[in-house]
Amino acid sequence: LLALLLVACGFQLRGSQPLPFSSLYIATGEGSELGAALRRNIRALGSTQLPATPQEAQAIFTVIGEAREKSILSLSGAGRVREFQLRYRFAYRVHDLKGREFVPPTEIVLVRDISFSDEQVLAKEYEEGLLYRDMQNDMVQQVMRRLAAAKIEG
């Protein structure tokens, strides 16, 4: 019944939106996991080409910075670490060779908290890796949504 009501009112899940660029050069370092994930997502859309050089592209995606940070969030009464805060920062811009900005310099910061135990060091290191991978996937999805919302004039 609920599904029928949702369909009747015109509700539909948000699908992947095509990017406004006919071609986009992704300027990331060699071996960048985030760059590879962005390329995979853009190829999956099928509407935007990924040329080998910036001269062939309508727009250029430039990474300004990418960093993983880890800081102590809380200590036990004995002075041992109980929680860490993980941060994943990513800054980028989208422009063309003439200097026009399609997406101005933008920084996205994702934060996750992780508990810590001296007795489970290996398990917590593995969990930390999973959290960073999860943050990277979230980052790719946020960047894709922001790219889809970019405005191109003329």
Regions found by a protein language model. Give the residues of each.
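Short acidic low-complexity segments
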Residues: 47-59
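Soluble non-cytosolic domains of exported or imported proteins
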Residues: 29-36, 81, 85, 125-138
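A structural "domain/chain start" motif
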Residues: 7-47, 152-154
